[in-house]
Each structure stands twice: as structure tokens, then as C-alpha cells.
Amino acid sequence: MKIKNKLLVLIAITIILGCEFKSDKKEPLNILWLVAEDLSPFYLNAYGDPRAATPNLDRLAREGVVYTNNFSVSGVCSPSRATLSTGLYPNSFGAQNMRTLFQQPAAREAGIIDYQAVPPDEVKMVSEIMRENGYYTTNNAKEDYQFFKSELAWDESSVFAHWRNRPDVNIPFFSIFNFGVCHESGMWNTKANFFDTGDEFPPDRSIKKWWEKYSNSHVPLLVPEDLDVQVPPYLPQNEIGKNAMKRMYTNVMRMDKGVGRILNQLEEDGLLEKTIIVWYSDHGGPLPRQKRLLYDSGLRVPLIIRYPNKDRAGERDDRLTSFVDFPPTLLSMVGIEPPNYMQGQAFEGSFKAEVPRKFIHGHADRFDESVDMIRAVRNKRFKYLKNFNPERPYYLPLAYRENMEVMQELLRMRDHGELDENQALWFRQSKEIEELFDTENDPHELNNIAKDPAYADVLAELREECESWMNQIDDKGFIREVDLIKKFYPNGKAQLTDKPNVEISDGKVSVSCETPGSRIGYRYTSEKAHYLGWKHYTGPVLERAGDTIEIITHRLGFKYAITSVFNGEQGKTFYPSNRHDN
């Protein structure tokens, strides 16, 4: 009897311990990135400017952490997104020019062709690493990575992509939603934007229905006509300058509405407290002397992170953070060790760096039809710029930017001798080789103190850091773009990923690829009706009667190859073409 009682006690203890073990097991967190475009932090209530009503961003700020020293690596989108997707500086692998794909007409007229930058062999898109670790990954919808995405990077990348499409609600997700309504083009294109405002998409996914609804619409100013705005000193201090500010604030409010729609969906699904929400902008503001430039108006970007259960709610974090830190931080947040090739450091999560970064770095190279090369280093107070083409003007004409009325007004004022001292600085015909700015006392970076003896030590420190950084990453800015293209496209065309090596035995399909850095994926044709993504190949795949297995091999920056297997026979291998092939 005693033995029986002891046995029952032992069983009970085992059950209790087992239950405790299960309860201690943490459920994987979801990650949601909400990405605005072309937006500086200076114009947001969370950062001190209440002119634009942003209730959803304000909520994130109240319930989360506001990061006050966050910086892009570039003042424009494509190089920034190259970094956000890889954890590499764009100028470390030839992705620094704006842009490599989808050239503007003026760039084509200047002889710039479409091409893909080619990252090193070992580099994966960070979303692919998330997929390999069990995450369902979606991107809605902007890509623009300076190379075509890995076909294994996303379960879905389209205007329809959503965590709600995952096949099992228990699968953790990493989802991105881009809000392009704040984009520079929104300063002159005032049509309502379906994708950015977050309206319900037609059930049949018909873009035509959306177009019919929105193509002739116009968004009026959402701020009062008499709103008292503060126009930056480098812009026209007249009605045109004020109207530009009002349009920018209006677009911020529209973006906030889209953010609110996604947050509501997250709450409807009961996922708010199971998700880390990261909201940021891809670079600085849309106005002249903001976007593309390496002043804080172009590099400094807002960042708000809401952690589950409002952890650290209301906190303001003044550590320096950079876009190159985002991929390692994303992985660190979900307990994945960042790969060694990443050039940034995690600022949160299990693999958070012990020492915060001391400097952030930035670059500016070709923008559309205009070529330059500038590098930037900044600590918490001082900004250093190195101009490698000092003989070139500060202002470089860009046909795209000149669609803006406020840009046209600046040029008119220049031509009529009406610019004041601050406005005229941007139109100087040559540059100083070195520039140094005290961003605390000179937030618009108008007063170059590089030659002031009082700041000689600061200048020397930042100059040394700039040189060290460029050497460390093997900066490709010194290579002419035409020579970069020859390196990436040695025969005048994109390099090809090797065809899949397929072996079929006993109903199993084994695949390999000889291209270094290539990835292998597969999918069954029967599954494409409800899922178009590719599964990672990790070992032999079973054939299914009457079904076709499609196989893909892809190395970033190369064209991918596709073949198929049906009834024990391999089909032809082909390389899909697109209008950007050369």
C-alpha cells in the first residue's frame, strides 16, 4: 500500500512539473513593421510638433518606446531598403546609387541602365532567415532592394500580403506594411491612395475596382488653412513654402489613418499583446534639402516600438541607432543569433550589444541623373561630412524633385536673386571638402564649423572614424558605376544561377545547386491555388501522384532558374525574363 501511495505521489509530481514546464514555454512573438516613407521626426507629435493629428502614432508612443536618435544610412529609399533587408551598408556591396533598378526617365537619358547589385555569397535577406526559423513572412508591398528579392524571402510580397493569409493561426509572423502616402510624390500628386489609407480591398482582389474608385479623387488639405506652420529656413518663407508644409502634414495624417487600420486588425485578431510593433520611416522628409541629403533632415528618422503588454511604456531612448542595426535587432528580438556578416549590432533582444554604438554613418552617391559622393559620420551631437567632389555644386538638378511647386519656387527665387542667406547656401557652386555641424546649436546644419580651431579635436575624431568606416566596409563609392555594372554583369547581362541538379530515386527528388550562395526552393503545383510561395528545400522531396514539383534555384543579384519534376521525369529548365533584363 505504501509503495502504491509513493507511486501515486511520484506520478502527481511528474504531472505538476510537466505542467509547469509547459506553462514556462514562451510562445514565439510576432513582429510587425509599419513603414512610412519620406518622413522626418521633427513633424510628429511624438517628437514635439502637434500640428498633424496622429492619434495612432500617439498611442504607439504612449504604450511603447520612442527612439530619439535613429538614423537611416541614406537619404533615399532604395539604398536604405538594401540595408534594411540585408544588414549591410549599401556602399559595402555596390548598392549605393539611387537607383539600380527602375530608373527614372532622366537617368535613362543620361545612359544609366537597370542592373542588380550583387551582395556577397553568404548574405540572405533577413526575412528569409525568419522563414527558415518558422516564421510566416509577408511584405505589403514595396520592395526596392537594389536587387530582385529572393524568391524564398517572403511567403507573400504583394498588395494583398497579410499575416491573415497564413495557413495556421498558430504560426508566428513577420509582416511589413508600407505607407507610401508620405512619399515625395505626394507633394504634387494629391489623388487618394487606396493602399496607403488602408481601405478594405475588394474581395475579388480587383485592382480595377480600386482604380475606378480612386483615380479621379483628390485629397484636400486636412489641416486648417490658417495653420501656423514653421517653414525651415532653407525653404521659401512665403505661401508656397507654407502650403508645402500643410500638404506634408496632411499626408502624415493620412498615413496615420493607415497605421490605425492595421493596428485595429491586429487587435481584432487578438494579437496585440503577442506582437512587437515597429513603426519608422525609410529616411528623412520629402521637401527640398531634406530627401537625398545627409543633413539630419535627410538621415534622421522616427522610430517607435511597442512591446507586448506595454513594456517600457512612455520611455524615450536616446541611444544612437541605425538602419544597419535593424536586421540583427529583428533576429535578436525573437531569439535568433544574427549572422556574423551583418555590419550592424542588435540594440534590443537576446543578442543586444553590450556597448551602444558611438557613431552612425551615411552615404550619398548618384541620385537619378546627377552624380556625387559624400560620406557622413555623426555622434550624438556633431555631424561630419566628407565631400569627394568639392568642385560640384551642393544643389544637383533632378527632374523628379522639380515636380514640387516649392522646388520650382526655390529655383525661381535663385534666378531672380531673391534667396536669403540661408536659402542661398544650398545653391553654392562648390563645396568645402569637409563640413562639421553642431546639431544641438545648429539643428538645420547651416553653419560649417570645420575650420573653427575650437572644434579641431572633434573634427579629427570624426574624420578618423569616417576613414576607418569606409576602409572597414570596403566602400564601393570609389568604383565608377559603369565598372560596377561590368563586375555585376560581366557579359553585359545579369549572371545566371546554376540550373538545379536533380536526382530522382524511389519517388524522392533530391536537388543541389553549384552556385555559391544559391538557395533552393520547391512547391507543388496543386498548392498554388491558395499559396504561391516557395518552401525551403532542406532534403529530398516526395513525389505525389499526378502532381508536379516546381524547383527554383536563386542567388541574390542573379537571375533564378526554375525546373519541374512530374511522374519521375525532369522538365526543361528556364530563366524567367522581365523588362529590366539587359
Go through each PLM region and give its residues.
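Short, compositionally stereotyped local motifs that mark structural "simplifiers"
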Residues: K4, A450, A460-E464, N471-N582
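Bacterial Sec-dependent signal peptides at the C-terminal "C-region" and cleavage site
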Residues: L17-E27, N582
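C-terminal cap/loop subdomain of S1 sulfatases and analogous C-terminal strand-loop tails that border
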Residues: F21-K22, P327, V334-E435, D457, ...
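Active-site-proximal cap/lid insertion segments
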Residues: K26, P41-R51, R166-P327, L331-M342, ...
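Loop/turn elements at helix/coil->beta-strand transitions in domains of secreted/extracellular proteins
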Residues: E27-L32, E63-T68, E132-T137, V169-F174, ...
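A short aromatic-rich beta-strand->coil structural motif
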Residues: I31, E37, L330, K383-R401, ...
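Active-site segment of extracytoplasmic enzymes that catalyze sulfate/phosphate-ester chemistry
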Residues: W33, S40-E122, I129, Y135
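Polar, surface-exposed loop/tail segments
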Residues: T54, L84, K142, F147-E151, ...
